[in-house]
Structure formats: C-alpha cells, structure tokens
C-alpha cells in the first residue's frame, strides 16, 4: 500500500529541490513588469510574458541600487534566485539585479532622470545666466587631444584675437569621467580671471556621451557661478548637460561664437559709427549756436544801444525832482515852525516861556539842518552813481558822433594841464583805439 504525503511534506520536498538546484540559484530572466506599485521599502510585483507569470520580490537594498525607476509595463532583464514560499506553495524569484531590456535601457534611464530633474526645477529658464558681451579669458573643459579644443581656439582667435583660452584637460568618457568633469567645473569657479566656461566633447554613441548625463554633472553645472556653454556631441545629440547649461551649442565652433558674440570687426565698426554720430551732433550744435548769435545780433539792444540807459536817465530825473521837493518841503516846514514860534513869542510876556521856546526853536533848527544834510547827502550819492553810469554809457554815443575821448590809465583827460611831455595816452574813436605819446606838454 502506498504512503500518502501531506501537502506540507510535498512542499518541503519541492523547496529542498529548488534550494539545491544550481540552475535555480542564479537565474537570468527576461519579463515584463506587471502589478507594480511602488512601496516605501521592499517591492513586490510580477514578471510575465505571453504565456506565463512569476511573482517577483526585490528587497530594499537591491531596489536602491537601480539606476532607473521601475514602471508598469517595462521590459527588464533580471538576475535572481527562485524559491518556494511554503505557506502558499507558490514559487517566486528574488531579484538581486535588474536593467532595462535591449538598447533602449540608457534611453529609459535618460528620460527618467530628465523627468526627475525637470520636476526639481534644474532646467527652468529663470536659473539661466546671461553670457557676457565681452570676454577676456574663456575656460574650456574637454579632452586636450580632441578636435573640440582646436576648433574653439581657431574660432575665437579669428573672431577676437587677444582673448585668452584656459584648457582644463578632462576625461570625457568612461569610468571616472563624470567625477573629473565635476572637479574641473569646481576648479574653474575658484578662479577670478575667467569670464565663462565651455564644457563639451565630440560626437559618439549614447554610451560615449553618458558622462554628461550623470546627475552629479548636472548638479555641478547648475551650481556654477560662471556662465556655462554646453557643446556635447553633434547637433542631433542631446544630453542633460545641454538642458541645464546657460546656453547650448550644436558644435564647438558654435560654442566659440557664443563665447565671443562681439567680434573685433564689430567693435571697430561701432567706434566708427560713434565717431560719426559725435561729429554730426557737434556740427548741429555749432549751427544752432551760430543761429542764436545771429538772432541776438538783430535784437533791439544791439541795434539801439541807447535804450540800455534810458531807464537810468528817467531815474536820475525822478531823483532830482524828489530832492528838490524834499528841500522845499523841509524849508516850508521850518518857516512855518519859525512863524509859529515868533507869533507865540510876541503874545507871551513871561521870560521863562520865551527861553523855553527859544531852546525848542534851536533844537528844531539843529534837527532840521542835520536831517536835511543827511537826506541831501544820500540823494547826492545816488545822483552821482547814476550820473557815473550814465556817463559811462554815454561815452559810446559821444564817440559815435565823431568825437574822441583821451584817457591815461583809464582816467579821462579833460585839460592839457593833466598831461606832461612823454606821457602815454589812449585815444578812443568810433572804430577803435590808438596810443600816442605827448611831445610837448607841461
């Protein structure tokens, strides 16, 4: 009679077979991700093909080592071991390593990292720095032996001779390339003599260009205080460094042109244009001032200069009349006061009263004399100043009528007694002045 096995015994037997089978200890498996929902730690999902499904488990330590994000429907290649879970009697694969399937693996990783960095704001235009219009020194991070550095040197030297180029020799592909790019970006930012950086390399496959897609390189370019031009690969090649850089150039030549937006010829043309504009502006100003002088020359003051002192003549007349009226008024007041006092003296007999009025009369006369003299002096001073001004202005009218004015050191000579033999005199005439020497004088 045959012995019947329990389910547990059968499951244990199968588990022992699975555990001891060398083919199941390290399985290479291809499948499509199904029923995936990202969890905080360990990941549980299925791998399937057209005909079968297997449960898959990835512990947190293995999941953190992935260079890409798992997604529903993604086809992946995994390495793991197959085991049986006794309580349910089901078998599954414990995944230790996983990569996207086929040649699109790096492309998937590229798109996933691009999406992540975009969401974090690394590619926003608001973070882009403006390139300087004029540069004196340009840093270049690239291979010292490639065509990139030669093209950059040739183009910059042609466009703007005198711009210095500082090369930071850098490994641009393979293991350690990303770290070397980051180190040289940091080194360049420590210098104070650089105006901008060009980071780039020649064309190649996506694997060759991958160093410029590394997240640490993107972070280094984003943090750079120097403006950075990215020139990686050919025009059709696009890297994450292109997205984060301040400007992207399709070729090294284009990068050099962006680094020198203004050429030497542009500056010479600009200076010539400025000189011409300055000349035209000066010419317009001279014409404007000439027209102003012509207008002033036709004004009434220059055609009828006597109008300059008409007001002074009127003022002198007013001062003269005011002085006469003031003197007459003071004299009239004095006579009236004297008549009043005399009348009172005639009608009063007391000696004391007479003496008192005599003293008041004397005081009044003194005050009147002082006041009249003060006002007379003030009016005379004002009259003399006005008369001097009038005489100064009037000399030109005298000369204009054919007379001459003789001066000795700015003093007008009015008599032959004022000069002696050998004195030097200046004679002012209508159209100029001559100097003469006295031959026969006092």
Swiss-Prot record:
Biological-process GO terms, alphabetical: DNA catabolic process
GO CC, alphabetical: cytoplasm; exodeoxyribonuclease VII complex
Hydrolase as UniProt keyword: yes
Cysteines paired by S-S bonds: none
Purpose: Bidirectionally degrades single-stranded DNA into large acid-insoluble oligonucleotides, which are then degraded further into small acid-soluble oligonucleotides.
Family named by the database record: Belongs to the XseA family.
Protein name in UniProt: Exodeoxyribonuclease 7 large subunit
